[in-house]
Amino acid sequence: MSKVLFVKANDRPAEQAVSSKMYETFVSTYKEANPNTEITELDLFALDLPYYGNIAISGGYKRSQGMELTAEEEKAVATVDQYLNQFLEADKVVFAFPLWNFTVPAPLITYISYLSQAGKTFKYTANGPEGLVGGKKVVVLGARGSDYSSEQMAPMEMAVNYVTTVLGFWGITNPETVVIEGHNQYPDRSQQIVEEGLENVKKVAAKF
């Protein structure tokens, strides 16, 4: 039985947030098409994950060197391990998030920091870093109210670009990406943009 991990990084309701609507649409469509799949859903805002910083980094290093950890470090490392192992065990992963102020919401950065561990999602080699989880099937769902498709705006998009860059570093070079954009910039076409985007979400979910 396939294990599927759904990761949502938006605490706004679907009535107000397009990426939340994309997430709900994908999950419901996928569940209907795959009733026997083992599914785990992570709401990153609800989890209130501790920032990835000195305690977790020091704990991870000390463990790798066989050194004794403080109680605080043990707790931080255990939290990282919990979410890292969950990700490693998943056959398929879906990320859903908005673009806020040119990048992803902070909880997603924290979560990705948990997953970016040498020897687990990538390794160092004489020829440079090498991804270790390229066999996973991944979908990226992103929403942004402005239109970033132009040559001028594209470099300012650091949400989907950020996530797909990290995935590529881990060896996942071909994630399927669905983006809904411009629904705030073009209010006269907003409903059409969202509806057409959600249809694309359904198509991807049905065959995922």
UniProtKB/Swiss-Prot annotation:
Membrane keyword on record: no
Superkingdom as given in the UniProt entry: Bacteria
Pfam families: Flavodoxin_2
EC number: 1.6.5.-, 1.7.1.17
Coiled-coil intervals: none
Cofactor(s) this protein requires: FMN
Top EC class, one word: oxidoreductase
Keyword NAD: yes
InterPro entries, per database record: Flavodoxin_fold (IPR003680), Flavoprotein-like_sf (IPR029039), FMN-dep_NADH:Q_OxRdtase_AzoR1 (IPR050104), NADH:quinone_OxRdtase_FMN_depd (IPR023048)
Record's cofactor remark: Binds 1 FMN per subunit.
Catalyzed chemical reaction(s): 2 a quinone + NADH + H(+) = 2 a 1,4-benzosemiquinone + NAD(+); N,N-dimethyl-1,4-phenylenediamine + anthranilate + 2 NAD(+) = 2-(4-dimethylaminophenyl)diazenylbenzoate + 2 NADH + 2 H(+)
Annotated keywords: Flavoprotein, FMN, NAD, Oxidoreductase
Gene Ontology molecular function terms on file: electron transfer activity; FMN binding; oxidoreductase activity, acting on NAD(P)H as acceptor; oxidoreductase activity, acting on NAD(P)H, quinone or similar compound as acceptor
UniProt similarity note: Belongs to the azoreductase type 1 family.
Record's function text: Quinone reductase that provides resistance to thiol-specific stress caused by electrophilic quinones. Also exhibits azoreductase activity. Catalyzes the reductive cleavage of the azo bond in aromatic azo compounds to the corresponding amines.
Subunit structure: Homodimer.
Protein name per UniProt: FMN-dependent NADH:quinone oxidoreductase 1
